[in-house]
């Protein structure tokens, strides 16, 4: 440069610096006209070395910036592109200067350079975008204002030229190959043709890594800057930014958690636009695919309608039809002019035709629409060949579902909902991860989140339900899904628990082995569900249990009932509140006989006598009162399976009153009387008296209507009378005593007991005594399959063992022993029926203040449960 120009550029006054820049511009223009490019190189080198790179000299850097801008203006649009690689680096370096004035002039200089370079500036877009991203958060208002002007200019250039501008940097006169070529032998001149470099100045694939790095910026101004740029790139035709959606989608979700409302607003708008674009492209590709399938169908129909029978041999006719079909199919990917070229197609080998048909079918069946070389003159629609990477998008969405921000969760759910309707199959590999988060959202406090989560969960359930047939085997990894469901079940609320059971039921129908492999977790899930108070959850759990405990899977039922009894033994509160209901529901869903058989055999192995007595009383009470047990009661009454009665009798021997109740249900009154006589030989405990009191109340229930009518036939049922009178003689005089006594006194007994017995004996000797009802009602136990003596001996053995155990306990604990009151281990209110009836027995009043009366729908339950001492006050009250 001339010294005057150099001095003017370094002047403190802006007017003098501006005048010097104009002189420099004239000088460079003169060099361009004269072709003195060497001097231009020296001027640029001087401006960079001595001025723009002069660190800690703000005035020198300002001079260099003005000089470089003037040089770029002088070079013009035709020549500036070749010098940008030397001009731009020092200008961009000044954006990081500590002096705000230098940063301001850097913005001004780059603005002037970009205004001249236009599309050529796009070659250095990454570097420019990087400095703009940093300067957008500048603390100085003047610098930020200049940066906004520069940013606006770069956006305009990108919007206009990014999708089609090809740089001329490598297409100048320097280094080009000759346009003509002369043949050295003949002397002929030929024109050379070279392939044009079609590489665009702007490269989106090169820009995406930088965007991925910057998208996680924290500064709100930078975030707004990034969102604005993404809008520009998204709306620029031909760039196809949506193809790189997974690269920046995760960063946009972090913007939604920004504390500044303007950041959240612009981000929300951008994400709506992105989702709309995804939806548009997917629908477009689906529409194009359907059109192609329709074209194929039309061609096939045209072939079928045009073919007529000929006199050719069958093999030749089939081959001809096949070649004709190949001709029609070939038209899908060839120009129209080639469709009529029968000669070329007729010479095609049949093996090649088959291979072409196979590839064509694979193309039509593919999920994404692939790009074809020629589309028979069809108009190209932007977006029809874009490949949307849904798996990576879903990964980002699932990660953001676990966010603590409600807005982020809502948008992630909305995206998942839309993509599920577009391409549901891509969610199959992500089911386990999605459900682990989605089930938590079902219990969210925000109703909007819960509502959308329910919809998404329903869509996923429908998706898995639609996977049927061998072709889908192995596509869904049910094992991880089951693990995820069982883990989420215990920490979830009711809605989430119900959803978990819905999934487990579905998986069992699809892949039973996957459920059966997770026995421990399944048992815990079912037990937790049955212990809950929600009716829908219990219904789902029972439905799953019914599926798991199929008729052929007794081992599963046994293991489940073992775990259930273990839970009851460990959780006394659960026994008090839910044991009756749980056992009743399980028996109603499964076969009652099957459940009673299995659970009775399990109780035989328990050493805890008190717990065993509790469970036997629950089973006995349910057998008498539950409507679901009517079939089992009828089976016991008709003695269809004597061995079943025998097994129940032996298992229930630890609880004598329950054994007597069983005999009453089976109408085996002789056996009941014998048991009563046998047990009277041992010391009667308070527990037994309480249960007898309850049994007397149960005699008034509808279940024993038949027994009460049988009291009118004393000659046929003498042991019924003896048993009832025996119970009357055993219990203390109380309200229960008065109730039973009134019932017995209401009978019109006009004969003595001896006459009744003699009449009974004479009737047994009569060969015509074979009435069907009397056979059922009055069976001789000694002649039946119930093995009378064996059962009585077993009962005696159990009673003696229990008597010995009681004596040992009294010796160990002495006078302070507190015996557990059977019948008082449940709460006073049956939570499933919510019915309370006033007590009828002062004996029970001596123990508990209130007691429910039985009905056919609920068990008899004593209130204020707990282990109570049999003290003197109770004894005195019983005596009274």
From Swiss-Prot:
One Pfam family in the UniProt entry: Vac14_Fab1_bd
UniProt keyword annotations, A-Z? Membrane, Phosphoprotein, Protein transport, Repeat, Transport, Vacuole
* UniProt comment concerning the protein's domains: The N-terminal domain mediates interaction with FAB1 and VAC7 while the C-terminal domain mediates interaction with FIG4.
Q: What does this protein do?
A: The PI(3,5)P2 regulatory complex regulates both the synthesis and turnover of phosphatidylinositol 3,5-bisphosphate (PtdIns(3,5)P2). Regulates the synthesis of PtdIns(3,5)P2 by positive activation of FAB1 and by controlling FIG4 localization. Required for FIG4-mediated turnover of PtdIns(3,5)P2 after hyperosmotic shock. Essential for the control of trafficking of some proteins to the vacuole lumen via the multivesicular body (MVB), and for maintenance of vacuole size and acidity.
The effect of residue 56 to Y is: Loss of interaction with ATG18 and VAC7
SUPFAM superfamilies cross-referenced by the UniProt entry: ARM repeat
Q: Where are the HEAT repeats?
A: 82-119, 243-280, 388-425, 429-466, 517-554
Subunit details: Component of the PI(3,5)P2 regulatory complex, composed of ATG18, FIG4, FAB1, VAC14 and VAC7. VAC14 nucleates the assembly of the complex and serves as a scaffold.
Q: Which is a Gene Ontology cellular component entry for this protein?
A: PAS complex
- Which residue windows does the record flag with biased composition (Polar residues)? 359-372
Q: What is the effect of changing residue 149 to R?
A: Loss of interaction with ATG18, FAB1 and VAC7. No loss of interaction with FIG4
| Protein name according to UniProt | Vacuole morphology and inheritance protein 14
Read off the PROSITE patterns from this record.
Answer: HEAT_REPEAT (PS50077)
Q: Which GO terms describe its biological process?
A: 1-phosphatidyl-1D-myo-inositol 3,5-bisphosphate metabolic process; cellular hyperosmotic response; phosphatidylinositol biosynthetic process; positive regulation of phosphorylation; protein localization to vacuolar membrane; protein transport; regulation of phosphatidylinositol biosynthetic process
Annotated membrane topology is: Peripheral membrane protein
Recall the GO molecular function terms of this protein's record. identical protein binding; protein-macromolecule adaptor activity
Phosphoserine modifications at? 767, 805, 867
Disordered: annotated span: 333-373, 850-880
Annotated consequence of substituting residue 61 to K: Loss of interaction with ATG18 and VAC7
The Swiss-Prot or TrEMBL record describes its family as follows:
Belongs to the VAC14 family.
Q: What is its main location?
A: membrane
**Where does it reside?**
Vacuole membrane
